[in-house]
Amino acid sequence: STGTTTKTETKSEESSKGGEVAEVTGDIPTKDQVNAMSSKQIVENIKVGWNLGNSLDSHDTNSSDTETGWGNPKTTQQMIDTVKAAGFNAVRIPVTWGEHMAADGTIDAAWMSRVKEVVDYAYNDGLYVILNVHHDDELWLVPTKDKLESDKATLTTIWKQICATFQDYDHRLIFEGMNETRVIGSAEEWTGGTQESYDVINQLFQAFVDTVRASGGSNTDRTVIVTDYAQSAEKNAIGGMIVPKDDHIIVSLHIYAPWNFCGPDDTRADWGSDSDKQELDTTFQYLDDTFISKGIPVIIDETGCVNKNENTSARVAWFSYYLSAAKKHGIKCFIWDNNETKNGFGLLNRKDCTWYYPEIIQAIQDATK
């Protein structure tokens, strides 16, 4: 970290007793300090992040309250406090906007107010916060040439309003333009995309960056996040990406690897062979060679592995290796958590603010100290 920071009181507990997790506290930069940081320094200061999944990103819920429409309780300050105490110093808040907009693109005031309230839970806790446009690709955003101009207009309309709402927040608040943008249902949806989709996504991200920069306040040099087709680690997708020329930028990818272990679609429940480890090492080295060695910081702002018949020891081994191997390259990670424990990514019990698998949280702490 840079300069002096405000030290918070440190309190530690035995993590092995009664399923408790050791409480972790750390340094919170002042506004002047964080606003003077480069995007690389901000990534250096992030230890590990947590995703508020299946909450403000919910949609098509047939519910008057989309936040709880996918089965999670309303987000509370206590939830974010619990995340902070467990050693996460960054929170990603996925938000889907498309169902909360008038025909002219105006975002519903009550929705924006609620998003701001949840951002404040994390921001006022001294955490780094990522705010994004999440499942809008399932509502209106399709990266094809035919839709480029209309989608660019919608995307910039959303970001103008987000920028106006948050322009006075310091640089612990980070904007991520889009999430896993892809042509849903196409043959290339998860295989890296096409040249047409690369061209469109590159233009959309450039429009996002331009919109943020033009919006004034702290947004003129706020760190922003861009990515490739589907936020994919496929080499063709990464090769098709044009990173906007900007001094305050991060590249983010989503890497649940290997998917047959991490994802819910396969029965593979074990992990830890030499070839398993080599696969991760090779991926992280590729990201280092492609971006980091050229001065572009990288985060993986979604990763994790699901519970498969309580394969907790394999998951502990995976988290330990994955996070420490990424850290060697300066890559910081955000764990996906949807509060789903049966074949899901749930770690935090959002009803009582306890951790379902304290040993996984301990492994995350140990790997990211």
State the predicted function of each range.
Residues 12-90:
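N-terminal carbohydrate-binding accessory modules
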Residues 24, 153-269, 273-276, 285-305, ...:
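Active-site region of glycoside hydrolase catalytic domains
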Residues 30, 71-90, 101, 105-135, ...:
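An active-site-proximal structural segment forming one wall of the substrate-binding cleft
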Residues 54-58, 90, 96-101, 135-139, ...:
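Solvent-exposed loop/turn segments at secondary-structure junctions
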